Amino acid sequence: MEAAVCDPLHRKYVLLPPVPDDLAASMMHHPATAHTPWCEAFLVPLDEEAETAFGVMWMLHFTTRLAVFVYSSTTRHWQAVASKEWNELLLGKGKSTMVSPIDRDFYGRYYAYGCFYWESTMMGKKDLLVFDTRRMEFSSCDLPPKELCPLGLAIVEAGEARLGLFGIHVEAGKFDLCYYIKGNKCESSSQWQLEKTIPICSGCWPDIKAATGRYLLLGKFGPMRFVNSTAHEDLEYISVDVKTLQLARVCTKSSGFAFSKTWIYTNFPPSLSSPKI
């Protein structure tokens, strides 16, 4: 796979070196590898003070296991993270799977306190997949016991090293946005605690679209309308301030683009070139 990191503000890009053959072979030539994996690549926030530093994570979803390569612009090298079987990470001992429990089209990927979080698409599974970018290790994290809508979660930073979790709960046709906080390692309780329940709407299905830093982005379909006998249903976007939990309308996406992917774009990415006078 060829990959490049782009700086849209300065219209620059850096072409990454290929993964060394020996690293690729160590991951691809595996006894359990029967099919070509689907891959995803994304930026990894780094703690370095250098403005031009960046990291890239290349994730390979095999049918029975998960493998990861990580690139650092500081070392200019790829590093292989030990692959893990899905039955070790999310399925429990003694079980197996023939498909990745992370859906390539509908899953959400969230970042908080140096860790990435993914929601499993397995029905009834109460775990999040976690990757610690400092330890370069996979693990799992439990979810709140309350029944939440599938594929409708978001992880945020709640402050003081505590995790925050947003989820949508539906009951009798009414949708609520539930906000949970998980205590940090220094607190007596590390269980999820319900912080607040925010009524969203009735009759129309809301969806968590993205989350980053300060804001959560919700999508909510509006009422059906007809234009020249053709049905249209627009998607309204609502932002949620993670600190104040205040809701605000952002914009409305027309019917033709309502089901397309959406991300939050805030601040500017690290420049790929050092500042010059």
Regions flagged by a language model, labelled:
Residues 2, 47-48, 73, 107-108, ...:
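C-terminal closing repeat unit and adjoining cap/tail of repeat-based domains
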